[in-house]
C-alpha cells in the first residue's frame, strides 16, 4: 500500500478595500452606508458577495421592488492583495399588490384570514409584510401548513398577486372525566372548538354532574370583537344546581 502526503495551498487571502454601488439604488443612504462600511477591511470571499446580494435584494423587496437585480462584481488587485467590490443595482419597476388570494380554507372564512394580512391590496408589495402575514396565519392555530407565493400579473410588469395556500387541521377538542367520592359518582364532559363554524371564534361547553350538583357552562371568545382588533371573551350561560343530601332522623 502506498501512502502519499499532499500539500494543499489555499493561496493568499485578499482584503476588501472598497465597496461601492453602481446603478440606481432607490434606498436611503442611511440604510445602505452602514452595510457597506461593515464590509470594508475584512477578508474577501465569494460567500461575502452572495450575502450582500441577498441583503440588498431583501431590502429592495421590502420597498416594493419585487424584481430587483443585484450583482456583485469583484475587481482584484493581485499585487496589493486587495479587492474592490462593486454591486450593480437594477431595481426595476416598483411593484403593486393587485390581489391577495387564499386557497385550501374549506372551513375557515376568507375574512378570518384577510384580517391577519399586513400586506394590503393596492399597496407596494413588501417581502417583509408578506412574510409577516404568513406567520400570522400560522399562529392562528387553524392550519397544518401555510405557504405563500407571488405571481406576476400577465400583461403587466409592475403588479403581482399574493397567493396563500393553507392546509386546515382539526380545531376541536373533546374531553371528559369520571370519578367517585363520598358523595357518589361524578361525571364531567367538555367540548372546545377554536374555530367555530370557520369564524375564528372560540366556543366551549362544559358539563359536570354528580348526585348532588350539576354545573353547566358555555364560554365564547371573539379575537376581533371590534374593527380595531380588540378581543372579548365571556360566558353568556352558566348554571349551577345544588341538591342538599337528606339527613335521616334518629
PLM feature spans:
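Conserved small/polar residues in nucleotide/adenosyl-binding loops
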Residues: 1-5, 240-246
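Periplasmic POTRA and POTRA-like interaction domains that precede
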Residues: 4-47, 72-127, 153-188, 228
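Gram-negative/organellar outer-membrane beta-barrel architecture
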Residues: 107, 123-242
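Amphipathic, non-transmembrane alpha-helical segments in extracytoplasmic/periplasmic proteins
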Residues: 48-67, 129-146
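Extended beta-sheet lipid-handling architectures
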Residues: 51, 67-69, 191, 220
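Short beta-strand elements
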Residues: 66-75, 144-152
Amino acid at each position: 500500500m502506498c501512502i502519499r502526503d499532499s500539500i494543499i495551498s489555499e493561496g493568499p487571502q485578499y482584503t476588501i478595500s472598497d465597496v461601492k454601488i453602481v446603478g440606481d439604488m432607490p434606498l436611503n443612504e442611511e440604510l445602505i452606508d452602514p452595510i457597506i462600511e461593515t464590509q470594508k477591511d475584512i477578508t474577501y470571499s465569494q460567500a461575502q458577495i452572495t450575502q450582500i446580494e441577498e441583503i440588498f435584494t431583501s431590502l429592495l423587496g421590502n420597498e416594493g421592488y419585487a424584481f430587483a437585480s443585484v450583482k456583485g462584481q469583484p475587481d482584484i488587485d493581485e499585487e496589493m492583495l486587495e479587492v474592490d467590490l462593486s454591486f450593480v443595482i437594477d431595481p426595476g419597476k416598483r411593484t403593486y399588490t393587485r390581489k391577495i388570494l387564499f386557497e385550501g380554507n374549506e372551513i375557515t372564512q376568507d375574512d378570518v384570514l384577510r384580517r391577519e394580512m399586513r400586506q394590503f391590496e393596492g399597496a407596494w408589495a413588501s417581502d417583509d409584510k408578506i412574510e409577516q402575514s404568513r406567520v400570522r396565519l400560522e399562529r392562528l392555530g387553524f392550519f397544518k401548513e401555510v405557504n405563500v407565493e407571488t405571481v406576476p400579473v400577465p400583461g403587466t410588469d409592475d403588479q403581482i398577486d399574493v397567493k396563500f395556500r393553507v392546509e386546515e387541521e382539526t380545531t376541536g377538542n373533546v374531553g371528559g372525566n369520571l370519578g367517585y367520592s363520598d358523595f357518589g359518582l361524578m361525571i364531567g364532559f367538555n367540548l372546545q372548538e377554536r374555530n367555530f363554524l370557520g369564524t375564528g371564534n372560540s366556543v366551549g361547553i362544559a358539563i359536570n354532574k354528580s348526585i348532588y350538583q350539576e354545573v353547566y357552562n358555555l364560554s365564547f371568545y371573539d379575537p376581533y370583537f371590534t374593527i380595531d382588533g380588540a378581543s372579548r371573551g365571556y360566558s353568556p350561560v352558566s348554571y349551577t344546581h345544588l341538591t342538599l343530601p337528606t339527613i335521616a332522623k334518629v
